[in-house]
């Protein structure tokens, strides 16, 4: 889609002259990694049908609530970087995009426009190793094989990651290698008990390569049919910020801690053990689900047995009641409504009809 209008805040935020975007494609200003995600979300919204009065009509795109996503938008290359030198390198800034389609009438008739509101993200930390005084949390979910399935967009200013960059990657890589033995015990408790109350603090890596400290409340979903763990949910409470407070800064290999090959191998062994635990350990929730399923089957079998025993008696009683009811209502109808009865003579029928009409 071609940009038709921008607000003046684009200059203060990204450095572009106000009208520089006019007539150009919005996707051209997005980070290459985010362009496909943006286009896919818009396309999916356009493809959603709406059923009204049993007929399929064109959907009101994204409903009344609109839709959101996180992506990076390019900064203006002409921004001055000091001493009259202009930075010609391409840089991007993360934003939360809120967008919806609107139908607008103009000289060409009814035209559909995409309206996008952008909210910039800034690092939530001001100082190195900042201790957070207010409670801040985000949600993350991964499958039994460790693949990250969902991460809360609220985590962006605290971790620095764009959600689509780390989705479908190994979530266990986010944990500090030195804390993996402790987390291995935590995961054993998760799969055995189904949940774990708020854990003690451990470290999680941010986008810039430094670590924050978090405490987590864990819960697991056990499939009642397969009795296997499907996924693990975690609510992560941030306790302490990273040594480098700018989580959006590119990682510096010289400043980030390096691991020896031995430490890397030990960390990978721990991750493999955690995945094995999630897929092999027999869990208490699974046993409970198995017992509940067995109990329900027994109750259903008992109910069907009782129902079959009572069916002949019930049919006999129903037959007798039906005969009495039919006879009673048959006589009552002929008297109250003046209905035609084969037991009455024609004169009686005429008299009854005249009486009911008067």
From Swiss-Prot:
The keyword ATP-binding appears for this protein: no
Location(s) in or outside the cell: Nucleus
Stretch forming the signal peptide: none
GO BP: any one term: circadian regulation of gene expression
GO cellular-component term (any): cytoplasm
Molecular function per GO: transcription cis-regulatory region binding; transcription corepressor binding
Residues annotated as domain PAS: 1-120, 138-240
SUPFAM superfamilies: PYP-like sensor domain (PAS domain)
Predominant subcellular localization, coarse grouping: nucleus
Entry PTM: Phosphorylated with a circadian rhythmicity.
Entry keyword set: Biological rhythms, Nucleus, Phosphoprotein, Repeat
Coiled coil: none
Subunit structure: Forms a heterodimer with timeless (TIM); the complex then translocates into the nucleus.
Function per UniProt: Involved in the generation of biological rhythms. The biological cycle depends on the rhythmic formation and nuclear localization of the tim-per complex. Light induces the degradation of tim, which promotes elimination of per. Nuclear activity of the heterodimer coordinatively regulates per and tim transcription negative feedback loop. Behaves as a negative element in circadian transcriptional loop. Does not appear to bind DNA, suggesting indirect transcriptional inhibition.
The protein, known as: Period circadian protein
Organism: Hyalophora cecropia
